[in-house]
Swiss-Prot record:
It comes from Schizosaccharomyces pombe (strain 972 / ATCC 24843). Residues 29-44, 192-221 have a biased composition (Polar residues). Its main location: nucleus. PROSITE patterns: ANK_REP_REGION (PS50297), ANK_REPEAT (PS50088), HTH_APSES (PS51299). It is found in: Nucleus. SUPFAM superfamilies: Ankyrin repeat, DNA-binding domain of Mlu1-box binding protein MBP1. This is Start control protein cdc10.
Length: 767
């Protein structure tokens, strides 16, 4: 195995996992149990280092977790203590001692060996061998340590160590060491049962000033040490402060400018700088009376938002979710005291309350419920927590217009400013989200309000005391997402000229291309005096495109490398860059040609559809016309029927008969003495009327005759069947039969029911 020689130098125990250098005089002798126990007994740096207590938490299972700032041989560490186990994080590069993490996880020897093989195979590790056994071992980068901690289920235990803001590392003095030891002892004996759950693991408590609980920054004074100027004096830390501590301002470690593959480094006291000392005057100068942000804010390196909490590893998940959800159903959001009373310390405020991973803070920020936001932040909700896509509560708030309607975005920034350096899964900041939302219909004014408020807030608070300057924020505006797009590129692509103007006036660069090589000028957005090409634009573009190379392609150059090797390396990089650029341009050109072809086809289809739409609209108009005509005709018919009904009711046929005294059976005669001479047309009209009446009468007579013939035939058959006489002889015998029936009884005494029944039987027999 590739790591065989490496493994021989270390002992992998079942109960402990430590890397210890073998004595030179006994290269093949394994570590004895006594030596291992000695190493475990001295698992902290108490005897050989300066330690300052930071804070303490209680895990869900009741175990206490303590966080210390440690300085050993001039090197700064953060130490997390959990029972008999410790875990160290090195401050300059955020490397973790992986042996301590595995010992904390209680892994077996086989698991330790497998993990060690993977680390050695990757090559991204550092083997430290010094006179301090607590520091010896294999150190791995931040990302890999996080991955291992999650895989072995100790991520939540290490959360205070992982999320601690290294910019807040304290400076050491003898007085602070004495005070920290006293406070640690008091907290260990009296405060464990009253502290918040593990999610609250910061040592600072936001001070209450101004209406939002955030200091303003007018007349701010400069400080030589921005990182240390936000540490509370250790004498002010008590159990109540620890209970109310918030973890939301602890950020991930800064990204290293150079991450080399380091293997074996020997550390000695002579190679490290002595620790800094802080006198009483300097300690008192850490907190001038000038108002400032409660915690420093750095835009030097951006970090990804925290993922949503996993409900499978959470206790009382459903209880926390139900209580937090019920708060949003309460219409009385203005009562902050009532809200804080509902938010008990046992609740997990970061629990997802919907299927998209949104926490209560996301919803409160989106619906602009400021009292609820203040209560959540005061109780320890983490604004760095994202949803399933990595969107923080601040990002979600700019997707709606509620804060524009209430003019409350400035107050929201005072509460959630700690999440400004966070990015989502696509690498986008809140400025990216503002520009993306500006492309939605009706959201342009809201996006401009959010952007201008954010820029004014950043300008107002830019100070060394707050951890950042305006140039850092301008670099933040120029941050590129995973597609290489800056916020200005997105605003130009969606065509919002107002957002483009605001960003460029704030100092955003218009010459940063995305991965496709497109910048602001390529999107057809032109702002006066803004897109003037600088003289060194070519060099700028080359440098910007070079920065888009992934970190894996960057090669670490030894300090004593010869100049010709450097030139050859640079030439290779430029050649590779040019080849990649040409290949990418060819691929993009092919995509553009394909897009043009699809565009032409889509245009033709659109023309055909428009023609069909025109025909359909014409037919629809005609149909509506015809329907209206039909409606008019039906109305006219109803009116005519109504008039006819009225005439029929007023018609008196008896009056006509009486006046005329006509006999219906009288023959038609022509009055020859009629003095009125009718015209030929009138006579023809009367003749035609008589002919029509005659035709109708003839037709009616024929129908009656045919019907009577059928009836006669049926009756003849009935009589034939009843009398047993041939049907052809019935007519001749009918008179005799009639006399016989009449003589059978008196007139009117014939049983017609029997006759009807008899006729029915005859009919069925015929069928």
């Amino acid at each position: 195995m590739a790591s065989a020689n490496f493994i021989r130098q270390f002992e992998l125990g079942n109960d402990s996992f430590s890397y210890q250098k073998r004595p030179e005089d006994e290269p093949s002798q394994p570590l004895s149990n006594r030596n291992i126990n000695k190493l475990n007994d001295s698992s902290t740096l108490k005897d050989s280092s300066s330690r300052i207590f930071i804070n303490s938490q209680v895990l869900r299972d009741g175990r206490p977790v303590e966080l210390y700032a440690v300085e050993c041989s001039g090197m700064k560490y953060m130490e997390l203590s959990c029972g008999d186990n410790v875990a160290l994080r090195r401050c300059p590069d955020s490397y973790f001692n992986i042996s301590q993490i595995l010992r904390l996880a209680g892994t077996s020897s086989s698991e330790n060996a497998k993990e060690l093989d993977d680390i050695i195979e990757s090559g991204d590790y550092e083997n430290v061998d010094s006179k301090h056994p607590q520091i010896d071992g294999v150190w791995v980068p931040y990302d890999r340590a996080i991955s291992i901690a999650k895989r072995y289920g100790v991520y939540e235990i290490l959360q205070p160590l992982i999320s601690f803001n290294l910019d807040l590392f304290p400076k050491f003095s003898k007085q602070q060491q004495i005070e920290s030891s006293s406070i640690s002892k008091n907290l260990n004996t009296s405060s464990f049962n009253t502290r918040s759950p593990l999610r609250n693991h910061n040592f600072s408590n936001p001070s209450k000033s101004s209406k939002n609980g955030v200091h303003t920054i007018n007349n701010m004074q400069s400080s030589p040490s921005p990182s240390s100027s936000f540490l509370l004096p250790l004498t002010q830390i008590d159990s109540q402060n620890v209970k109310r501590s918030n973890n939301y301002l602890s950020t991930s470690p800064p990204i290293l400018e150079q991450r080399l593959k380091r293997h074996r480094i020997d550390v000695s006291d002579e190679d490290l700088h002595p620790s800094s000392q802080l006198n009483d005057n300097e300690a008192s100068s850490l907190f001038p009376d000038t108002p400032r942000l409660n915690h420093s804010l750095s835009f030097v390196s951006l970090v990804s938002s925290l993922p949503p909490l996993d409900q499978n590893i959470m206790q009382d998940y459903h209880t926390s979710k139900d209580i937090l959800t019920s708060i949003f159903l309460d219409v009385n959001f203005a009562d902050s005291s009532a809200l804080e009373a509902k938010l008990s310390d046992s609740l997990d405020l970061d629990v997802p309350i919907d299927e998209l991973g949104h926490a209560a803070l996301h919803w409160a920020a989106a619906v602009a419920k400021m009292p609820l936001l203040q209560a959540l932040i005061h109780k320890g909700a983490n604004p760095l927590r994202g949803n399933l896509t990595g969107e923080t509560a601040l990002m979600r708030s700019v997707l709606v217009t509620n804060h524009l309607n209430q003019n409350s975005f400035g107050d929201l920034l005072d509460l959630l400013y700690a999440s400004l350096p966070c990015t989502d899964r696509a690498g986008r900041t809140v400025v990216h989200h503002i520009c993306l939302t500006a492309g939605i219909k009706g959201r342009g004014s809201a996006s401009r309000y959010y952007l201008e408020t954010l820029l004014n807030w950043a300008k107002k608070h830019a100070s060394g005391n707050n951890g950042y300057m305006l140039k850092d924020f301008i670099n933040y505006l120029n941050h590129q997402d995973k597609n290489g797009d800056t916020a200005l590129n997105i605003a130009a692509r969606i065509g919002n000229k107002n957002i483009v103007e605001v960003l460029m006036q704030a100092g955003a660069s218009a010459y940063i291309p995305n991965r496709a090589g497109l910048s602001v000028a390529n999107f057809g957005i032109f702002v006066e005096n803004a897109l003037k090409q600088p003289e060194d634009s070519k060099q700028t573009k080359v440098s910007l495109m070079s920065e888009n190379l992934s970190s894996k392609e960057k090669t670490a150059v030894p300090p004593r490398q010869k100049s010709r090797d450097i030139i050859a390396s640079v030439t290779d990089v430029i050649s590779s860059l040019d080849k990649d650029f040409q290949d990418e341009m060819a691929a993009k050109q092919s995509m553009i040609d394909s897009a043009y072809t699809q565009l032409r086809e889509s245009t033709k289809k659109l023309s055909d559809l428009r023609e069909q739409l025109h025909v359909s609209e014409t037919q629809r108009t005609l149909f509506l016309e015809l329907r209206q005509r039909c409606k008019n005709l039906m109305t006219s018919i109803e009116e005519q029927k109504s008039e006819l009904s009225n005439l029929y009711e007023s018609f008196d046929p008896n009056g006509i008969h009486d006046s005329l005294s006509l006999d219906a059976d009288a023959p038609f005669t022509v009055n020859e003495n009629n003095n009125k001479n009718l015209s030929i047309a009138e006579l023809k009209f009367q003749v035609a009327a008589y002919e029509r009446n005659e035709a109708r009468l003839n037709e009616l007579a024929n129908k009656l005759w045919q019907r009577n013939s059928n009836i006669k035939s049926k009756c003849r058959r009935v009589v034939s069947l009843c009398t047993g006489v041939d049907e052809s002889r019935v007519d001749s015998l009918l008179e005799s039969l009639l006399q016989a029936v009449e003589s059978d009884g008196q007139q009117g005494e014939v049983d017609m029911g029997r006759v009807a029944g008899f006729l029915r039987v005859v009919k069925e027999h015929q069928a």
